[in-house]
Amino acid sequence: EAEGTYVKEEYEMEEAVITGIASDTSEVKVTIRQVPDAPNVAARVFGALAAANVNLDMIIQNVSEAGFTDISFTTPGADLPRAKETMERIVPEIGAREFIVDEDIAKVSLVGTGMKSSPGVAARAFSTLGENQINILAISTSPIRLSVVVDGAQAAAAVRCLHKAFDLDSDSVFEETQLSAEEIAAKMNKGR
């Protein structure tokens, strides 16, 4: 055989839309009820949380009704004592009615770089969860991640049904991980 360079045809592999699913049960959700819908209120709330060194993940604000709104956020469970202390002080200061804490939640994230160029991922995920009687409590998106908050007792069922809906093999599922979606995506892309 002759020495030299062999030229072969290169085939691009199709990029998977969803490459992994992560479930994180370590977060809690805090909701501030009947917050006056006025300028600077959110800044005061989240400024106070930042000053107390409370890490935030998802933030949700409802549509204003009769001049009031609800604001919810998720935070690591380890930050809950500081979050509660901050809420006990800031809720009366801003004129909100109350705050409530839900410690039995799970964040389920679908991760994949193909999401940014594939319409319909959210619709498929939401339909799958709905068909399995899993209620979505909050939603967050980025170009490579779709996260939903569900009842903690439904976390495993959510992961299973989404796993099936997106045809993922079992090696792609990271249940109850402490990794962020970006860390999971990096880990999965490293194996390619």
Predicted regions and their residues:
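C-terminal catalytic "cap/lid" subdomain
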Residues: 1-192
